[in-house]
């Protein structure tokens, strides 16, 4: 698998998010939920040479892919080979050891949350990682419309949680798809 094509987000929404990161001169970036590593690779290579890029993922969990870890590791190595300080933390983003490792590598200019999609997951990731972020936090899947017949994706609660999170912050939304994806951004 090539890092260039392994993206779970809308490509145009991701490009717009990258443009925002570049505009505010992000030099350190944290991604929670990397799956195959495509977004980490695309975002990482768009930042200034030498930027610190950290990914946190737990391959094989719900909405993840059991075979994702080798691809994710390959993408992190590809970013590192381009002259970036890229690191991967394999583990649950809610575990104390993982949080401690992330904090030891921070602070970060920007964080992108695309891990667990339940209310508890999103809230916990936002609360844990917005505090070590100095500029902005992006949250993926704010436009996802739940389809009752799609049982395996029925617990995606991002749109509802996004409505609560954005109330306390200056924010904007990147929405190019009508029923899927979407990136919400809050300034911290």
Q: Where do the model's predicted regions map?
A:
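S-adenosylmethionine/decaboxylated-SAM
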Residues: 2-188
